[in-house]
Amino acid sequence: MTVDNVFIHAVPREQIRRRYSYFEAFEKNCHIQGILSKRALYMLIPCFMEFAVGSIVYSFGVPGWVLGMNTVLAAGFLVMFLFLVWPCFQLVDERQIEEPGEDEMALNAGGYYPYAEEVPPPSYPSLEEENEGNEEIEESEEMNTLLSK
């Protein structure tokens, strides 16, 4: 049992289990997957640009193979977007929590948390002890100066 588990189970379940909006879930899941959301969303820009260019080109009566290539490019960008970004939306949008074991429930029942015990303050050396060390250094420096003469 780790400290994190004890802390998670000590918090009321209502506070932990909350629904995230799709945007929050997208941000969290993109962070988990190592996908920067801005870069992933920027992939939609060329997709829309290709569709826009395709519609403009079509209105001018350009040959069909140009329109076909344009549509293929736009579809390619759309597929790349779907494969890279859409899984972020499909991940869990509610935090999953494992149920606490018997030991953890027994610990939490009494409000006893191992990490909350009082820790004695660190013992610092007294001023006299610190000065003794300084005096020894001063004496050794005096001896060195006398010996060097």
UniProtKB/Swiss-Prot annotation:
Keyword field contains Calcium: no
Region: Disordered, residue numbers: 116-149
Topology relative to the membrane: Multi-pass membrane protein
Phosphoserine PTM positions: 21
Transmembrane segments annotated in the record for this chain: 48-68, 72-92
Biased amino acid composition, Acidic residues: 127-142
Location(s) in or outside the cell: Membrane
Annotated signal peptide: none
The keyword Cell division is assigned to this record: no
A GO-annotated cellular component: membrane
Keywords in alphabetical order: Membrane, Phosphoprotein, Transmembrane, Transmembrane helix
Protein name: Uncharacterized membrane protein C622.01c
Naturally occurring in which organism (per UniProt): Schizosaccharomyces pombe (strain 972 / ATCC 24843) (Fission yeast)
